[in-house]
């Protein structure tokens, strides 16, 4: 549903319950790169790889892991590499992968699964010392033929104390980066760029105590999205640059999400600024903080929807057709303790906008205050004048058009700014 324009948001604070939002402990690898290099460096060129974009690099990486997976650095020097054998590294400890080259998917390979998978183990780091390392999935070779069930790029599963940073993930045939049941991790200084179609998710994450910051995503589906089984996340300085937008979704049976912070989220020409999607199921979502959102040209702004179902594109591109604030909760189990404040929204088309609330209690927008009442409700509030502070800045790197699905997508340069006025927490590795 990524049609043209919707609204502009200058600042938004949404608070559910009382969380201040934070990590529960330290994140990132337990030992430094220099410590790992002091143990051993395994250059993939010594294990049969060649940087000619013709010879498979997958098996040489796995061979290098045999020597460096229990302590050391697997080094992929600058140059172009072809991957035909998908990489699966299991239960490594105190090791890193220094990806300074570019890995290209073999266009004739029909294997599914993840091109690059790290599972189990601890104290792991995937990074580029030049900030120019990348994985190029060449997904357009699938997409131009209408195929979207295809390989994914990067998977981190059940790993503790880890980081991924200073690399680009480009044109995934399916998902770009999936984090499953990982803990104490950090993701930063990344650029993810995919085609303009659903199912090409940027980052999907579940686990405990994870910090994701200073990341740019371009696609038409999830930007940075939290999945069930997520706790103690801090997600900030995120640049959804012509994307699907950030979300919390696939919340079905056994939902269990708590202590999640989204802060400093800039959303340009996307489906939504933030959406929580569910339809039935059971479980609990609690203690969420959404703070400092800026958006331009988005189809939806804040959409908490417990009646989500597949929808056709909504006609119209104004705030009356697409409510910028929409909080829809179940009749049997309403949402409580929601605070919406300091919100400045206005439509880019038309002269009015609506807020829609249903069985949601708290303060702000169209919420009802009395959650002790057993009466269900649904209400629509119409706003006919622009708030005084709704105008917001833009970013210099805002895209003027999406990338299609029938041509190669260029590898982007990782930006040095991900949110207006916010300095990234870490300088690019390649800047030193």
From Swiss-Prot:
One term under GO cellular component: extracellular region
EC code: 3.2.1.-
Known glycosylation sites: 53, 91, 106, 241, 256
Name of the protein in its database record: Probable rhamnogalacturonase E
Top enzyme class: hydrolase
A Pfam short name: Glyco_hydro_28
Species for this entry: Aspergillus oryzae (strain ATCC 42149 / RIB 40) (Yellow koji mold)
Coiled coil regions in record: none
One Gene Ontology biological process: cell wall organization
Family: Belongs to the glycosyl hydrolase 28 family.
Active site, renumbered: 221 (proton donor), 296
Keywords for the protein's UniProt record, in alphabetical order: Carbohydrate metabolism, Cell wall biogenesis/degradation, Disulfide bond, Glycoprotein, Glycosidase, Hydrolase, Polysaccharide degradation, Secreted, Signal
Role noted for this protein: Pectinolytic enzymes consist of four classes of enzymes: pectine lyase, polygalacturonase, pectin methylesterase and rhamnogalacturonase. Hydrolyzes alpha-D-galacturonopyranosyl-(1,2)-alpha-L-rhamnopyranosyl linkages in the backbone of the hairy regions of pectins.
InterPro entries, sorted: Glyco_hydro_28, Pectin_lyas_fold, Pectin_lyase_fold/virulence
Compartmental location: Secreted
Signal peptide: 1-21
SS bonds (residue pairs): 42-68, 223-240, 329-335, 357-366
Entry GO MF terms: polygalacturonase activity; rhamnogalacturonan alpha-L-rhamnopyranosyl-(1->4)-alpha-D-galactopyranosyluronide lyase activity
